[in-house]
Amino acid sequence: MGKLFGTDGVRGVANKELTPDLAFRLGQAGAYVLSKEHPHPRIVIGKDTRISGDMLEAALIAGICSVGADVLRVGVLPTPGIAYLTRTLKASAGVVISASHNPVQDNGIKFFSSTGYKLPDAVEEEIEDLVHSHEKPWAIPVGSEIGRVIEIQDAQRRYMDFLKGTVGSLAGIKVVYDGSNGAASHVGPQVLRELGVEVIPLSVTPDGININAGCGSTHPEVLQQAVIEHKADLGLANDGDADRLIAVDENGEIVDGDFIMVICALALKAKGQLMEDSVVVTVMSNLGLHIALKEAGIRVYETQVGDRYVMEELLKTGARLGGEQSGHIIFLDHNTTGDGLLTALQLLAVLKEQGKPISKLAAKMQRLPQVLINVRVKDKKKAMENPYVFQKVEEVKRFLGERGRVLVRSSGTESLVRVMVEGQDHEQLMGLAQSVVDIIKREEL
């Protein structure tokens, strides 16, 4: 697989790239590195609904127990729920088996520290070095020193109670909820109903194969139609591991992470609760977000793509709200990672407080036209370093000047290069983006 850790843990095609053997070795190395401070460590493990989850979980657990660590198994649970339980169960570390919004054949393994944060690059590198190394620095336990598996039967209930504690009653709101047949398929509709929301559920019947299949935050088309058909106040869509949220307004229009951050930031600022009067976003956020927040006296910090980098900037600046256009949004006062259900509840709370339709709240931001084209490539690094691609990007930058921007970046989790162009005229932007894409494709031949 080359370098194991990407921007969101280890990802690959399950049983081909991410094999049980690799999961076993990651379990051993991860447990050893993350548990050095603990004499008999305990590690939380959870997963999404993919068919390969059971296989990889079994291998991972075997690796962890073989170095003398106990496993706290929480079963199917959203990624942010696993981060929350890692903290509150006072575990030494947490592990999520999920490939988030990726298709069913993929899976992933992602570690959390004892505080519920994603691991720093240096710690991931230490784990990776051990996975590749023939040296095994840990002692081999026998007898009573081998790790046990402890089932956490009420894991979903604990997470739902935490979520409910962040807002008041949401009675009177009608929502179409799309669980992407993923980790939030049960807890999503349940927590909404317990808060008084009228819920029309979509894609909440996982069968191991249908996760993210034409549903969820990356495929909101069915949700858009359902919101209009049911005359709902809004639609909410999570992805496979429910660490992101995309909303749909009452007219069936997409309300992405940029709009959600603007809505929540303005509401928090109005109540004097926006720490540092600041928000952290990535370079992919629309220029319209920058304009809307600047007009409200809110400072915007920008970082590279990846919610781990958003988190680092939040900790550095003292801001408490940050996220990505894709819907990874971090409310640091409540949780240590992007949390799709938490974000949904905060958004619904603003809706209830202000008594306005979500389309009116979203109108505070005017989105500038933006074109994003994903190009599948054999070698991301080679494509990104190609001089002809660089030359074309510089040409587009000069043409746009201050009227827009162009951004070319490689995906952290897939073999893709993303070309994003933003400006005033959509048709013109399509042509500019395509001109960059054409060079990337030409150089692939």
Curated annotation (Swiss-Prot):
Any one of the GO BP annotations: UDP-N-acetylglucosamine biosynthetic process
Catalytic machinery residues: 100
GO cellular component: cytosol
NCBIfam families according to UniProt: glmM, PRK10887.1
Organism (species): Desulfitobacterium hafniense (strain Y51)
Catalyzed chemical reaction(s): alpha-D-glucosamine 1-phosphate = D-glucosamine 6-phosphate
GO MF annotations, alphabetized: magnesium ion binding; phosphoglucosamine mutase activity; phosphomannomutase activity
Name of the protein in question: Phosphoglucosamine mutase
Recorded superkingdom: Bacteria
Post-translational modification: Activated by phosphorylation.
Homology family: Belongs to the phosphohexose mutase family.
EC top class, as a word: isomerase
Residues bearing PTM Phosphoserine: 100
Signal peptide span: none
Keywords, sorted A to Z: Isomerase, Magnesium, Metal-binding, Phosphoprotein
Residues engaged in binding Mg(2+): 100, 239, 241, 243
Cofactor(s) recorded in Swiss-Prot or TrEMBL: Mg(2+)
The keyword Phosphoprotein is annotated on this UniProt entry: yes
Free-text comment on the cofactor: Binds 1 Mg(2+) ion per subunit.
Function: Catalyzes the conversion of glucosamine-6-phosphate to glucosamine-1-phosphate.
